[in-house]
């Protein structure tokens, strides 16, 4: 099974999501999803998260907080989720992958029709923990 890291990025009670490319060759094309990607051989989870966020946003948070691990049999992978607070101005983030990025409140996320269920579930879980970080 592939190992995957995902970041739940938050700022001012909003969450940053990526509109994935609309390519049939990728998983969950044209959906609002979390930033992240595959862990390469010999790479640690935090190292993989740093690489992915640097590639996708030209940014990496000062701290990552572990949230959960989930085995996804549908996509044959194990996802490790981290929470990251974005302390830089929004204009400092540069989209390197995907069609777009956008900040959403948790209520806005619930209204999206093209978001994988696991993204919604993990955002809800993170939302409960953020005030304790």
Protein language model features and the residues they cover:
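Nudix hydrolase/Nudix homology domain
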Residues: 25, 29, 94-133
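The catalytic Nudix box helix
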Residues: 34-67
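Active-site-adjacent beta-strand/loop module that shapes the phosphate/pyrophosphate-binding cleft
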Residues: 11, 60, 70-92, 102, ...
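Conserved N-terminal beta-strand and adjoining loop/helix that marks the start
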Residues: 1-17, 35-38
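Short loop/turn microsegments at loop-to-beta-strand junctions
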Residues: 4-5, 44, 99
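Recognition helices and adjacent regulatory flanks at domain boundaries
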Residues: 14-16, 21-24, 51-55, 59, ...
């Amino acid at each position: 099974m592939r190992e995957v890291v995902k970041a739940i990025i938050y700022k001012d009670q909003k969450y940053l999501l990526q509109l994935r490319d609309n390519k049939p060759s990728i998983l969950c094309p044209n959906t609002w999803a979390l930033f992240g990607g595959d862990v390469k051989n010999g790479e640690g989870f935090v190292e993989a998260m740093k690489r992915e966020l640097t590639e996708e946003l030209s940014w990496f948070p000062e701290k990552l907080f572990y949230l959960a691990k989930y085995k996804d049999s549908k996509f044959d992978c194990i996802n490790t989720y981290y929470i990251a607070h974005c302390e830089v101005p929004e204009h400092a983030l540069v989209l390197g992958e995907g069609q777009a990025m956008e900040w959403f409140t948790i209520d806005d996320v619930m209204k999206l029709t093209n978001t994988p269920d696991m993204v919604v579930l993990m955002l809800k879980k993170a939302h409960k923990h953020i005030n304790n970080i």
